[in-house]
Amino acid sequence: QPYTFVAYSDPYATYIANVLDRFSNGEDFTYTLMDLNGDGVQELITKEPDGQEMTIFTIRNGERKDYARGVSYVCEGNILEECEIWDDTGRRYYGFYRCGAEEAEFIEKVVRDPYTLYWGHAFAGQDGKTIREDQAWEIINSYKHIDLTMKSFTEYPLR
């Protein structure tokens, strides 16, 4: 029986039921719940099958809303990390975001230029500057990843 013909009171349940109906591998999508911004509402953190990036949703005014996309890691202190590495060029991007009330708010980034292989660093609202590789890794490693316990969408309590 299709999941989406049921009227769910939980906006996350409606989304998950839709995925389970639409995708033949819906059971391979995973989720966890965590209050990332301290507002008392659990954010829905999702990952597609074989996906490296997470999509995060929240509930505002009784509706599911996008909170953040392209998230690689959740870090201690309710920080989100976006990490992009291009092995063929040497380019790297590490962006760090604080979990704000409405959305993820940019804090700082560390990048590696694929042509010069120099490292750069910039805070929100400031111009970037060149830094040494050891400084780059010190900044990147200062954000500690949290191990998330992800569950199959089929385990979500549809209500």
Place the predicted regions along the sequence by residue:
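Acidic, small-residue rich beta-repeat scaffolds with periodic aromatic anchors
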Residues: Q1-F5, D21-R22, C83-R159
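Extracellular structured ligand-interaction cores
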Residues: V41, M54, Y93-Y94
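Short, solvent-exposed loop/turn segments at conserved positions within beta-propeller repeat blades
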Residues: P49-Q52, T89-G90
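Beta-propeller blade repeat segments, especially FG-GAP/WD-type strand-to-loop junctions
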Residues: E53-Y67, Y97-G100
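Beta-propeller blade termini
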Residues: E27-L36, S72-E81
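Residue-level detector of high-confidence beta-strand sites
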Residues: K47, D66-R69, I107-K109
